[in-house]
Amino acid sequence: MSIPLSLVLKQLEGSPSSVVPLLSTLYYDKSILNNISKSDSKHLVSRILNLTRSPIEYNKWAGTNLIRVISDNYTILATEGSNLFGELVKNLDSYNDTVNIKVLTSTVEALNYLCDKIRGKPTMTREILTPKLSTIITLYMDKLHFSPLIIIKSLKKLIQFHPTTFRPFGNKLRAKLITFLHLQDFVNFPEPLKSAIYQTLASLPAIEKTEPELKWESDVKSLIKELKSVLAIYNEFLNLGDDSSLPRLFEQLPSFEENQKNDKILPDMVIDVNEPSSVFQISTRVDILLNLLNAYVTYATQFSVKVPLGLVLVVNEIICSINVRYISYKNDVRDEQIRKIVKSTTVLNSLNSIKFLKDLAFTYKGSMLPHLGNILSLLEVLVPFKNKKIDYDELIIQEVLNRELLSCVSVYLSLVSFLSDHTQLLRFVDVGLLLVEPRITDSTAQQNNNNHNSNGGKKHKKNKNTTAIPLSDILSHQHLFNEAIPEATVNIVRQFMSAVITTVTLPPTQHYKIMRYILIQAVHSRYYNNEHLIPRELRSLLINAVLYPGYEKISLLPIVSTILGDDPLLSVFNNPRFPPLPIYVKNVKDESVFEEEEEEEEEHEQEEKEIELPEQKRAIDEDELPEAKKRKMEDEPQVIQQEQIEQVVEDKIFTKVNPETVVHFAPTKEVEPESRTIQNQKPETVPEPVPVAPVQQMSQNINGDEDESDFEMPEIDVDDSDEE
């Protein structure tokens, strides 16, 4: 619903009762601003600016949003852009903690919107944006602590598009962002805020005056050196020498020199064994440094850089290799609490490493394929084993880690169309199947074990068994005691299975287990849930099971078609569409070719008419001729007619086709025509014509004569007899 401009101006005289209809009208009805007169335009802008100057927070917020809407009109932005910028900058400068935060966020968003509208237009950028840009950057940095997420994102965009103007503020912004990293609660910040801080720090090398790529490379190597120094602390708790490859991997990473220790981003750690919680500083430090390194190598830059993928993968391999299942604790670490904390820190480090590897696959895609075998090997180390079997209890305890593990493997499998070696994936398949198995609650399992143990002891008195009823429920309705599997785990496992069956030929054991799980889940989702809908991941998994049957001798198509009856892809298998028969279509290129074809058809019709005319004439004269003459004349025209018809038929059937004017839909085998010749027997000598009277028996047709006699009547000279 649109409001007339006069009513809009009237509403803006004072405090509008509701700004939503005004915003909707000015935003959707473009004709109002496109056809506005100069006087109405001035009234509209002045009244909106009066709202932004109002001390009332609602009016200030309404005026700020109205500025954002009217800036879509180029005429208003060109004529009043400087005034609009000035009022927004004043509101930003006067903001304090007593004002509602909505005023600050709407002001920053309006300024960013105006910058985006002006950016790229040389004259407006020079006259309006450039003079205000330094003031905007200064105010953003001063108000950073009020709304860090939106302001940091705004600063990152200004660094990207105006690196030269931002150069004087680079060191100040870097110091502010590193202050956030030093906070103890930084790891508890929201993920969008942490990601914005990491990416803004990674974009700062762009403001360098010369050789920004060298500054970027120096920052990346400094982060790798700092990560190495943090990971080396585990040598105080674990015997890293148990793994012979770990010392070699540490040697491959660069180290800080004596004069470079001040280049560290984070301060030194203080770990006290008497305070076991201080050990968590290791995983916190690894989390920050690894995510910052991730931002450097995955965030796009305006200049070319040389990414040290080899060193990055070595860092991740060291993190995954520091595993307490394969590396023993040192003898002086006897406190069980410290041991558990050290184990927890290694799990957290592995989780961050898996996320990093997944981001590398998304960013560099095919460039990661040469390292695929190495990556799968280091991920395989994270699968929990006990007595040569997967430890189910540990698997469930570290469910988040194993879920991310399968997700990372799925991403790397999506980079290839086929993988010949399936041995590295068998453990991951077993992990996925175990994660989606029905889970019995611990209390139920413990109660069941206690009952078994009590039955195996001494005989008790025959008192009433108080545990019979709950035990009977467990035996008869076990599915009601199963623990619900997280939806995120189910979706990731389904995606992983879909990626596996489409890229790898698994052994029969694992393949049949996957097929069994697929069918059970499909039937359950189709008939035993309230909505009777198949989830997207399960639908994709069912279709891939049909397309890639593996060792199945019997197709899953009938079962899957029953469950997914509306799928268009499966309908192709159930109702195959055969291709049409090849048809020759003449391709008329121009009018001259079309006219030539018409002329050929006319000539052909004319020839047929010429052939038919003598036949019609003979048919008229046949009744007047004697039988002997008729018999002789019937013989000759028939031979000529048969030859001509044969030639016409051959031209129609065996005409050579020009490939440039004919479209072939399918190759066909060339058929050679069988030539058949009609031999007409002619007498070797023709006797002299003798006048003979007509005989009734000679009227029999030669063609109907079955004895095939060689006798032929001589020609009768009818004309001569008539003249006489």
Swiss-Prot record:
Biased composition (Basic and acidic residues): 611-635
Comp. bias intervals (Acidic residues): 593-610, 704-724
Main subcellular location of this protein, as a coarse class: nucleus
Coiled-coil residues: none
A GO cellular-component term linked to this record: nucleus
Keywords of this entry: Nucleus, Ribosome biogenesis, rRNA processing
Superkingdom assignment: Eukaryota
PANTHER family in the cross-refs: PROLINE-, GLUTAMIC ACID- AND LEUCINE-RICH PROTEIN 1 (PTHR34105:SF1)
Family according to the record: Belongs to the RIX1/PELP1 family.
Function: Component of the RIX1 complex required for processing of ITS2 sequences from 35S pre-rRNA and the nucleoplasmic transit of the pre-60S ribosomal subunits. Regulates pre-60S association of the critical remodeling factor MDN1.
Descriptive protein name: Pre-rRNA-processing protein RIX1
